[in-house]
Amino acid sequence: MLDIKFVRENPDIVKENIRKKFQNAKLPLVDEAIALDAQRRQAINEGEALKAERNKLSKANGPLFGRLKKCADEAEKAEIQKQIDANNAAVKANADRMALLEEQKAQAEAALNKIMLVIPQIIDETVPIGPDDSCNVEVERFGEPKTPDFEVPYHTDIMERFDGIDLDAAGRVSGSGFYYLLGDIARLHEAVLAYARDFMIDKGFTYCIPPFMIHGNVVEGVMSQTDMDGMMYKIEGEDLYLIGTSEHSMIGRVIDQIIPEDKLPQTLTSYSPCFRKEKGSHGIEERGIYRIHQFEKQEMIVVCKPEDSRDWYEKLWRFSVELFRNFDIPVRQLECCSGDLADLKVKSCDIEAWSPRQQK
C-alpha cells in the first residue's frame, strides 16, 4: 500500500492517479484517510505528552516519600501526604486518559488501514490510460503467427485421442473446472514445468517450492480485497487460504522483513499448484482447460532495490518471451492500461501466445 505520509503530503497526486484508473468512487477515501491519520497522530502526540507527565509525577513522589518518612511534624506530614495523593490522582487520571487515547488510536489505525488497502498504487508515467483491457496497447510481436491449411483440432480432442485427459471423471469427483491428466500427456505436462524451472535456473534464479497456504494478513499484503474475494479459497475454521499463485507466498516471505542491501537482488523461481475460484465464461471454451480452478505454474520473483526495479521488469518479461520462443510459439507483448492494472501494481504487461485454432 501507499505510505500515508505520501498521501498526506500529496493528496492531489493520489486523487489524479485514482482518476487515471477510472475509480472515481474512491476519491473521497483520500480525504478520509488524511482525517483518520490526523486523529491517529493527535492521539499519539497527546498520549506521549501524558506519558511524560505521568513519569514526572511518579518521579516527584520519590522525594516526597523520603520527606514523609523523616518528618516529625504532623501538619507538615499531612501536607506532604496531600501532595502525594494529588500526584497519585493525576497519575490515575493520566492512565485513564491514555487508555482512552490508545483505544481511539487503535480504532483510527484499523479504519485507516482498511482504506489504505483500497487506494491504488501510483502508476508509472509510461502506463497507457484506459478503463479496461480493451485499451491495452500492443508493444511488440515476436515470431510470425502461422495459420495451418487444415482445421486445427480442439486441444481436449487431441488429448483424448491419447487417452491423456478425463474431464468426465473430474466432473463427477470435483465438479467443473477440474481434470485428470494421464499417461504421456501427464508426463508432457511435467516436462514443460521442468523445462521452465531449468530455464530460470540457467538464468541464475534459485528454485523454490513455497507453502501452498497462507495467512489472511499475507493475502491482504499481496492483493486487493476484491481480488481476494473473487479468487481465493479459504480453509474453513482456519486463518489460511489456498494460494492463487506462488507469487502470493513468495512475496509474503519478505513482507515486513529488513533485507541487507548486500543481499539484493534476490532472484527466485517458484513452483506451485494454484487454486482459483474463476470459471470459464467463453462458451465452448468451458469444456477445455483454459479457465480452471486448479493448475500448476512456474513463477519468477525478484526482490531488489527500487531504483533497479525497472531494469528487472524489462528482464522478466523478456525471459517470458524467450521461453515461448524456445518452443517456436509466436507471442506478443501487451502493455496493460491503467484501468486493467491491479491496485497493487505500478506497471504490468501481458505476454500472449498465438493460438492457431482460435486464430488469436
Task: List PLM regions with ranges.
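N-terminal alpha-helical targeting/anchoring segments
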Residues: 1-145, 160, 164
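TRNA-recognition modules of translation machinery and tRNA-sensing kinases, especially anticodon-binding
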Residues: 27, 141-360
